[in-house]
A protein has these predicted regions:
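C-terminal region of N-terminal signal peptides and the immediate post-cleavage residues
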Residues: 17-30
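Secreted, luminal/periplasmic, and some membrane-associated catalytic domains
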Residues: 56, 72, 79-81, 100-159, ...
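Bacterial N-terminal signal peptides
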Residues: 8-18
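Catalytic-site neighborhoods of secreted/periplasmic enzymes
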Residues: 138-173, 178-239
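Acidic, His- and aromatic-enriched active-site or binding-groove loops in soluble protein domains
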Residues: 91-104, 202, 218-267, 304-324, ...
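Beta-strand elements within well-structured catalytic alpha/beta cores of enzymes
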Residues: 33-46, 63-65, 89, 194, ...
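Short, structured active-site-proximal loop/turn typified by the sulfatase FGly-forming signature C/S-X-P-X-R
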Residues: 49-99, 200-202
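Active-site His/acidic residue clusters
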Residues: 207-208, 212-230, 268-321, 358-360
Length: 395
C-alpha cells in the first residue's frame, strides 16, 4: 500500500524509511541539523498530497513539498497498519526483522497473559498490544485518574508504561514475567540512538502500547504522551470513542498538536517543565484516517469521490485541518529561531484502500456502547453512528 513520504534532508542515517522537508529553503545552507520533527498523517496517500498541493499552492504542505525532497514511491510495511508502520519508520525494519507484525497477533512461544506459575504451562498466546493494555481503556488518560478530562489531558504522564495493566501482557516462559511492548521489539529505534548520543527525545501517539517505540532498552523516549483514542468521547459515559466522529478526532489530535507545540517551545508535552526542544520528536494524526473510513460525519460524506482520487467533503476538511497544524508547527519553529537547524519529516504509518468508493464494501456494525464491550474483544468502529455537531475544531 503506497504511503506519502515528503522529505528534504535525511538528518539521521537511521531514518532510512522516512524523508524530510526543511522549514526554510536550505539548498545553500550548511547549518547543522539539531532537531527532527516527525509527523505521521495516518491514511495519507501520495495522490492526496498531489491533489492538495495542486489545489492549495500557498499551503503549508505545499511549502514543505516545494522546499524539500519528495519520495513518491515509498511503501508501508506488510501487513500495513499503525503498529507495524510506526515501528518501521523508527527502526528501518520490516515485520520479519522487528518482530512486530500487528498489534493483535499470535505468539507460539510466550505464555498466556496472567500466568504467574510457569511450570508445565503450554505456550501460545494472543498478544494484544492495543487499548486493551490500558488500566482503564475507556478513559482518555488510560486510567491515570486525572480529574479534569478531556481538557486537562496534557497533565497525563510522559511515562505510560505505568498505565499498562500487566495482567494483560503475555508472559516470558524463561523469566515468568510479563513482556511489555518494548521488550517484544527485536531491534533498536532512532530514539535509542539519540539517547545514546545524549540527545532529548519525545513522541505523541494513540495508545499506551506505543511504549514499544522506547525500543528494547525501554528508555528510548523521555517524554511519551499517549492519550487513549479509543476511550469514551468526548466525556466519560459516551457511547462512542474519538474515532467515531471526525470532529472529535480533530479535537483528539489537537491535544497532541499542543503537546508538540509545547515541545518546540522547549517544554515537556504538558508545558509545565522547561527541558529544551527535543532532538527527535513528533506525533501521528488520526483525522485524515477517520475521514477516509467514516461513510459520513458532521453532515459531510467521507472518503473519496467516484474517481477514487478526489477527496470528498469530509476528507477535504481533514486535509485542510492537517495543513493548518503543519503551518502552526512551522511558525513555532521560526518563532523559536530553530528554522535553520530543524528538519520536518512528513510521512504516514499507512494509507487506506480501496480509495474508489465503488470498490469498497462496508460491513454493517452494531451500535452498541463501548462500555459494554468485554475486555479482550477489540472495539469495532461504529461507522453507522452520526450526529449533528460543529464542523470546526479549535486547537
Amino acid at each position: 500500500m503506497k504511503r506519502f513520504l515528503a522529505v528534504g534532508i535525511v538528518a539521521v542515517s537511521a531514518l532510512a524509511l522516512v524523508v524530510a522537508s526543511a522549514v526554510a529553503a536550505r539548498s545553500q545552507d550548511r547549518s547543522p541539523t539539531k532537531h527532527v520533527l516527525l509527523l505521521s498523517v495516518d491514511g495519507l496517500h501520495q495522490s492526496d498530497v498531489v491533489w492538495f498541493v495542486n489545489h492549495n499552492p500557498k499551503s503549508a504542505l505545499a511549502a514543505l513539498v516545494r522546499r524539500g525532497v519528495e519520495f513518491a514511491n515509498a511503501q508501508s510495511p506488510f501487513p500495513s497498519d499503525s503498529f507495524p508502520g510506526m515501528v518501521g519508520q523508527v527502526t528501518g525494519g520490516n515485520p520479519s526483522s522487528t518482530g512486530i507484525y500487528y498489534d493483535d497477533s499470535w505468539n507460539t512461544e510466550l505464555l498466556p497473559a496472567g500466568t504467574t506459575s510457569c511450570d508445565c504451562v503450554k505456550p501460545g498466546v494472543e498478544v494484544t498490544y492495543f487499548e486493551q493494555l490500558d488500566k482503564n481503556p475507556l478513559a482518555l488518560d488510560a486510567g491515570q485518574g486525572l480529574p479534569d478530562l478531556p481538557g486537562g489531558i496534557l497533565k497525563m504522564t510522559g511515562a505510560p508504561k505505568s498505565l499498562i495493566d500487566e495482567t494483560q501482557l503475555p508472559v516470558d516462559p524463561k523469566t515468568c514475567k510479563p513482556v511489555f511492548p518494548h521488550q517484544y521489539l527485536k531491534v533498536n529505534t532512532i530514539f535509542e540512538v539519540a539517547r545514546n548520543a545524549g540527545l532529548r527525545t519525545a513522541w505523541s501517539d494513540k495508545h499506551t502500547a506505543y511504549e514499544v517505540l522506547n525500543g528494547p532498552s525501554g528508555t528510548g523516549i523521555q517524554d511519551l504522551f499517549t492519550p487513549e483514542i479509543n476511550s469514551e468521547a468526548p466525556t466519560p459515559g459516551s457511547p462512542i470513542d474519538w474515532t467515531n466522529d471526525n470532529a472529535l478526532t480533530m479535537q483528539y489530535d489537537c491535544y497532541k498538536v499542543q503537546a508538540v507545540l509545547n515541545e518546540i517551545n522547549g517544554y515537556d508535552h504538558s508545558g509545565a517543565s522547561k527541558v529544551g526542544t527535543p532532538a527527535i520528536f513528533g506525533m501521528n494524526f488520526q483525522t485524515v484516517s477517520t475521514a477516509e473510513k467514516l461513510p459520513a460525519s458532521n453532515g459531510l460524506t467521507g472518503g473519496y469521490l467516484s474517481d477514487g482520487v478526489t477527496p470528498g467533503p469530509l476528507l477535504s476538511r481533514a486535509l485542510v485541518y492537517v495543513d493548518t497544524q503543519v503551518g502552526k508547527f512551522s511558525q513555532a519553529i521560526r518563532d523559536q529561531h530553530l528554522d535553520d537547524s530543524t528538519v520536518i519529516i512528513l510521512s504516514a504509518k499507512h494509507a487506506q484502500s480501496p480509495q474508489n468508493p465503488l470498490a469498497l464494501t462496508r460491513i454493517p456494525t452494531a451500535r452498541s456502547s463501548t462500555r459494554s464491550t468485554p475486555r479482550g474483544s477489540r472495539r469495532v468502529t461504529r461507522a453507522t453512528w452520526s450526529r449533528s455537531r460543529s464542523t470546526t475544531t479549535r486547537c
